[in-house]
A protein has these predicted regions:
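Short, basic/aromatic recognition patches that contact phosphate-bearing ligands
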Residues: 1-90
């Protein structure tokens, strides 16, 4: 689940923009069609996995309590990363 969540998280933040951890987890629950609770530390581990997979930083704004990807172009202009994100989008439709 860690890798799947990591890929989904990057896709979500690119599509939706900055969002809170609570909203992100709610959207993940809808995506997998299952109620889940993700502890703050677990979320942090998943976030780090996403950063490792995509070679980017998922930043946090303490003022708004939102996570975001500052340099989306780094991901969207890389063919392999685009393929990963498109795979997630395609499975979301199915």
């Amino acid at each position: 689940m860690k890798t799947e969540f990591a890929i989904w998280l990057v896709s979500y933040l690119i599509r939706r923009g900055p969002d809170t951890q609570e909203n992100i987890i709610n959207e993940w629950s809808k995506y997998i069609n299952e109620d889940v609770e993700i502890h703050r530390n677990t979320f942090g581990n998943y976030r780090k996995k996403a950063e490792e997979l995509f070679g980017t930083e998922i930043s946090y704004n303490p003022g708004t309590k939102e996570y975001y990807i500052e340099d989306k172009d780094l991901i969207t202009h890389n063919a392999m990363y685009r393929w990963l994100l498109q795979s997630v989008s395609a499975s979301n439709v199915i």
